[in-house]
């Protein structure tokens, strides 16, 4: 089992879209994947249609036992655990690690979507991740967030760039750049990723290629 955090202290850089797309692509590649929303705002939870979940990651981090019956599944073939606003409270730093060790079934890959700020839930994610991936575009805003993230942890942080320009300071960066499109929001329909709604499009293929590179880094190819 490998754990990755999709993290950036900057907002608006495509972090949640990336976490969702990686989970879909990993499932397409035959990897049993669990996606966990660790953002108190619950952007991913709402995107996937879990507006009023019965149980959330906060419940499991504060003592609720997770069973296979309580584990939400999606039409895109990955398992999902939603978030709620209680993630803003102080949680024991070892609570996520303990929870992941007691999962009711084995997973090849666990993807953690994190808050776009320096929250306790981000610290939890960094404490358990085998590798951290952060989306970076050509803006100074996202580059600063990358450097800030690298200063926070000893875990390897790899940039995933988008656009034509790869900033030197991003290194190490994934060998595949994401294609971003102004039409992307229109292609994400309902609770489905662009990998489902525009399966053979260039944008979807770029996310698929990035995910395969991630699996190679993790030794899961």
What is each PLM-predicted segment?
Residues 2-40:
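Walker A/P-loop phosphate-binding motif and the immediately C-terminal alpha-helix
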Residues 160-198, 207, 213, 217:
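Beta-strand-loop-alpha "switch" segments that mediate conformational coupling across diverse proteins
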Residues 28, 32-105, 189:
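P-loop/Walker-type NTP enzyme "switch/lid" segment
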Residues 121-139:
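Inter-motif core of Ras-like GTPase G domains
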